[in-house]
Structures are given as structure tokens and as C-alpha cells.
């Protein structure tokens, strides 16, 4: 089975900021305690694109991250409601890259200290030459690690909604949000 992950990562140190974002958006979801300066969020309604209900309510720095292991990956970085950086790479038939909204400066700002170095390391995987290179280099993982995302593998609303009740000990500190 292929991994499909879709999540939001809000820059901050107070879990209440993530809860408030989902509440303003009127969506169900789960908010994870801050780690590495990111508050990880999964929200109902996965569409593999940033949900306008969330981005329209954003007041901070928010990263939308998608990894569809055998198909491609993408990210979009928002500062407030404004899209500041985006990238999409797919490889269903041929490798397709859309980096028309890519901005290393915006990613560096989001990371703060050491951001430029981390972004430079991740840039090596942004333009795969063929499908094998796109899969073998694990670009989504490399990017997520460079961005210091605390959670990104097998991380989506449906997975968390199922596991939250099945394995509560793995979700200590996680807040379930209902509109």
C-alpha cells in the first residue's frame, strides 16, 4: 500500500494557535504539540491541495505538505493568507515539476536560523531527471527533514482519526478539534 500524507504545519510554540486555526476554519481535525517550532495539524477533507477554509483563516506561517509516495509530492507555504512559496512534482507517467511559485527566501524565513543551509540541501532533490530519480531520492522525506517537520510519514486526517481511538497512548497531548 502506498503512503499518502497530507498535513499542515504552523510555525509556533503554543498548541492553542493550531486549535484556533481549525476552529476559525470550521473544520474537524487533530492538533499536535509543538516540536521543532512547528505545530502539526491534520484536518478533515483531504484534497491534496491547500484548503481555502484553512488558508483564509491563517494568521501565521503555515506549510501545507503532501506526499503521495508513488505519484508525487507538493508543498505550499503561506504567510497569513498569502501564498509565498509553492512546489509540485508528480510522476504518474513522466516527471512533471511546477516550481513557478518556488521561493527559497520564503522557506529560509520560515525556518529562521540555519534556514538557508537547510533549504539549499533540499533544493538538490527538486528537479528529478526521471521517474526512478524522483522515487529513489525520496524527495518528500528529504524536504520534510530539511524543514524540520516533526511528523510527516503516514500522517493524514484519516490515519490519525482511526488511530487516535485505537492507540491513545501514542497521542498524548494531541487535541481533537470539532467545529
Region annotations inferred by a language model:
Residues 22, 42-43:
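A composition-biased, non-transmembrane "mature-region" signal
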Residues 3-6, 35-39, 59-61, 72-73:
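Short, surface-exposed beta-edge/turn micro-motifs
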Residues 43-179:
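Charged interaction segments
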Residues 1-35:
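Short, extreme N-terminal segment that most often corresponds to the first beta-strand
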